[in-house]
Regions:
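C-terminal active-site/capping subdomain that shapes the small-molecule cofactor and substrate pocket
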Residues: 237-306
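Short alpha-helices
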Residues: 112-163, 197, 275-326
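Glycine-rich phosphate-binding loops that contact phosphosugars or nucleotide phosphates
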Residues: 36-166, 170, 241-271
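Short, mixed-charge aromatic SLiMs
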Residues: 163-178, 226-235, 312-326
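Cofactor-/ligand-binding subdomain signature composed of acidic, glycine-rich
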Residues: 1-30, 144, 153-156
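Anionic-ligand anchoring segments at beta-strand to alpha-helix junctions in alpha/beta enzyme folds, i.e.
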Residues: 26, 30-80, 185-235
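Cofactor-pocket helix-loop regions in the catalytic cores of large enzyme subunits
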Residues: 26, 173-186
Length: 326
């Protein structure tokens, strides 16, 4: 029997695009019947869920790693409401953080897809998000829905988001394919992801997906800090990804020029038109589309560089070390 044809970056993004579009159009929208009075809220999660929580910073709230609360045994200062985010509802640090907040008399909210879960059982209020029925080699579907749940809790009408995001995916794919084609033929030693706060959630998600897909050391860097610190990286091969939104273009360009003089490869990803900039809550939609782009970019880069996602199963994937054990 002939071997199955090897997937290419373009074929992988085409398959992922079709699958995610179908799942989005088939899923019910994320809705919130009533927006909770959050006061001064802190959103906590881990991994993809923390990236989802960063959406809340656009609305004046804070987002922290759930482990920073749980393992320091210290609740955030000036916090009225703790919002726990976990798709499964079983992430150990997130459940424990919510329990700490509940026991201290704070208001607690859970954002999850699982109504019968330890996280949901702990919260005063539960905001359920639908699960997208889609198979993914490098996942983003959970984040797409949890991030909508975060936005909805913050008062955004997310009812049209699935449709709007589905309509944007061809443009997202075209952007990704163009940038993957321009990547160096071999993997860098490490990667920096630069952004302004308007894309902090999407940038964080790019970091997560590049680590999962490519197995490289990847970090997120505030734009201005790249000129103060990243300027000294080298002489080893280094890839700098600039995620650009509506603001700061001239500063991105100047810093890109400076970083290139040190031998770095700089890739500028313009996210302004990944979604309709005139749509209601366009900034949140753009951040979601940026996260999807990062997922497909990471998978494409892994294929280009011959690096199997999740180290090809060479590490234990049962995730027991992050689940609730009591």
């Amino acid at each position: 029997m002939p071997a199955a044809p090897r997937s290419t970056p373009a074929s992988a993004s085409a398959s992922a695009c079709a699958a995610l579009r179908a799942a989005l159009l088939d899923a019910p929208p994320v809705t919130v019947n009533s927006v909770p009075d959050l006061g001064r809220a802190v959103f906590v999660g881990s991994g993809d869920s923390l990236a989802s929580g960063l959406i809340a910073t656009e609305f004046g709230h804070r987002a922290l790693s759930a482990g920073d609360v749980t393992w320091s045994q210290t609740l955030p200062a000036a916090c009225d409401t703790l919002v726990g985010i976990s798709h499964s509802g079983t992430s150990g640090a997130t459940v424990r953080a919510l329990r700490m907040a509940r026991d201290a008399g704070l208001k607690t909210v859970a954002i999850t897809s699982q109504a019968s879960s330890p996280l949901a059982d702990t919260a005063d209020e539960v905001r359920l998000v639908p699960t997208l029925r889609v198979e993914e080699e490098v996942p983003c579907a959970g984040h797409v829905m949890l991030a909508q749940g975060v936005a909805a809790v913050c008062g955004v009408d997310t009812t049209p988001f699935n449709q709007a995001l589905a309509q944007s995916l061809d443009g997202v794919r075209a952007t990704v394919d163009a940038h993957v084609r321009d990547l160096p033929g071999s993997a860098p030693a490490a990667v920096s992801v630069l952004s302004l706060p308007e894309l902090c959630s999407g940038a964080d998600f790019w970091v997560l997906k590049l680590i999962e897909a490519c197995g490289l050391a990847v970090r997120t860097v505030p734009l201005e800090e790249s000129g103060h610190v990243d300027y000294f990286i080298g002489p080893q091969a280094h890839l700098t990804l600039q995620l650009m939104g509506p603001h700061g273009r001239s500063r991105f360009d100047r810093l890109a020029e400076a970083l290139r003089t040190t031998g770095q490869t700089v890739c500028q990803v313009d996210t302004r038109h990944l979604t309709d900039p005139s749509a209601p809550d366009a900034a949140v939609l753009r951040d979601l589309a940026t996260a999807v782009a990062g997922t497909w970019f990471a998978h494409g880069a892994a294929l280009r560089w011959g690096r199997p996602p999740f180290r090809g199963g060479a590490v234990n994937m049962d995730a027991r070390h992050i689940k609730l054990d009591s």
